[in-house]
């Protein structure tokens, strides 16, 4: 049966979405709406006109919590009256539940943010992040709920004493969820340490559009340089210092390497300093944030993709590189070994091992034939296991199974 037929009449709430959404969430929303699923996006942002005319998609504006205390209380009062008109019993219940729930935010803020959902109904409520499910825990009693476990909120944040509320909130949300989506087997095993019942979990791996991300139709630049690329937020868990150390080793070995970094983040200054301190200014190009078209252009001009992460679920950036026909050197963080088979689509090396990264890149530089072989294998792997259309179908089946 076609996916669109299977999904007929299904109404799904995406709760706690920032705007604009992450690229992978935007792709999922569009994939679902194209299959006949009605998606309501709950966001404090203001989607632009292009999103507001997408068939089968509507927006539920949720209140922010900025401004003076008086203005926040005034907004909360107005929302309370509107919610009580829709359903007074549900409004009272929401107030009681937020007082019983532990969080890093005040009960008043959480109550205010719950009010837009009072008196409204969906077949399934979807939480793209663990923290969102914890924040909106009372919503999980309104409809069957699904939570996504993606990476850092499972394998990093629970170790932070300042985020004990997240660690302690995982088990209650797992118990209430009708199903839990994990981006990899590795993330599923990590989540099991915090109370996930594996029997209610489903692994649906990240995906990309191989029609968009594809090898260049013409030859790659051939000026003698070995072009290595990486994309991702400039944050500590991406391990950029280890990548730069590997590049430094290649330079010392006489490899004419050019390392391109695409992305921005909280540690931009640290990245700039490290490039300067390692005297890599002539070998590293930091593009900052680029448009999707700009990212594609740089991927198609590269010779290899490097992922130096300390923590991952499965990197969408790596899948985009593979779809463009690039061999990959990746750490074994999280579920990366589920996406890249060592010696087939690239090389899998230990985390924090700049020497192993350098050795793998050196092998790819010395052997253009191996680059082509691994790049072709990577694209075939994406076509077989990581197609965006297959991922959307899998989510439709998951939502339908709990509705």
Q: Residue locations for each model-derived region?
A:
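Carbohydrate-associated surface elements
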Residues: 186, 207
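Membrane-proximal helix-turn-helix segments that form the acceptor-binding/catalytic region
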Residues: 112-119, 160-180
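Conserved acidic donor-binding segment of nucleotide-sugar-dependent glycosyltransferases
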Residues: 342-343, 347-354, 363-368
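A conserved mid-protein helix/loop that constitutes part of the nucleotide-sugar donor-binding site
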Residues: 23-27, 226, 230-249, 266-272, ...
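Short hydrophobic beta-strand element within catalytic cores of glycosyltransferases
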Residues: 327-330, 340
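Aromatic "clamp/platform" in nucleotide-sugar-dependent glycosyltransferases that forms part
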Residues: 310
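Active-site donor-binding acidic/aromatic loop of nucleotide-activated sugar
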Residues: 267, 281-291, 298
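Acidic anion/phosphate-binding donor-loop and adjacent secondary structure
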Residues: 157-160, 192, 198, 208-224
């Amino acid at each position: 049966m076609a996916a669109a037929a299977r999904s007929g009449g299904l109404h799904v709430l995406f709760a706690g979405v920032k705007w604009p959404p992450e690229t992978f969430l935007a792709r999922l929303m569009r994939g679902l709406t194209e299959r006949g699923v009605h998606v309501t996006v709950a966001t404090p942002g203001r989607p632009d006109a292009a999103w507001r005319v997408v068939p089968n998609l509507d927006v539920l504006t949720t209140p922010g919590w900025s401004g003076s205390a008086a203005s926040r209380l005034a907004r909360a009062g107005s929302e309370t009256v509107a919610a009580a008109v829709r359903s007074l019993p549900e409004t009272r219940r929401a107030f009681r539940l937020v007082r019983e729930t532990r969080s890093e935010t005040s009960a008043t803020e959480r109550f205010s943010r719950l009010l837009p959902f009072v008196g409204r109904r969906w077949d399934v409520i979807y939480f793209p992040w663990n923290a969102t499910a914890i924040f909106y825990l009372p919503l999980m009693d309104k409809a069957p709920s699904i939570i996504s476990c993606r990476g850092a909120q499972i394998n990093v944040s629970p170790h932070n004493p300042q985020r004990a509320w997240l660690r302690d909130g995982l088990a209650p949300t797992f118990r209430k969820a009708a199903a839990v989506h994990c981006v990899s087997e590795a993330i599923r095993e990590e989540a099991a340490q915090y109370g996930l019942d594996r029997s209610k979990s489903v692994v649906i791996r990240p995906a990309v559009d191989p029609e968009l991300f594809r090898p260049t139709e013409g030859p790659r630049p051939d000026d003698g340089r070995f072009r290595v690329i990486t994309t991702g937020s400039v944050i500590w868990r991406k391990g950029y210092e280890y990548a730069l150390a590997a590049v430094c080793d290649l330079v010392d070995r006489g490899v004419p390497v050019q390392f391109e970094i695409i992305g921005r983040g909280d540690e931009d200054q640290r990245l700039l300093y490290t490039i300067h301190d390692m005297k890599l200014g002539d070998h590293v190009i930091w593009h900052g944030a680029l448009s999707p078209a700009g990212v594609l252009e740089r991927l198609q001009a590269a010779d290899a993709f490097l992922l130096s992460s300390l923590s991952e679920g499965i990197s969408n950036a790596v899948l985009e590189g593979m779809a463009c026909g690039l061999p990959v050197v990746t750490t074994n963080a999280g579920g990366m070994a589920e996406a890249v088979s060592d010696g087939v689509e690239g090389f899998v090396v230990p985390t924090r091992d700049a020497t192993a990264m350098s050795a793998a890149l050196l092998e790819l530089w010395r052997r253009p034939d191996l680059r082509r072989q691994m790049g072709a294998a990577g694209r075939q792997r994406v076509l077989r296991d990581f197609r965006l259309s297959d991922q959307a179908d899998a989510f439709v089946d998951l939502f339908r199974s709990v509705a």
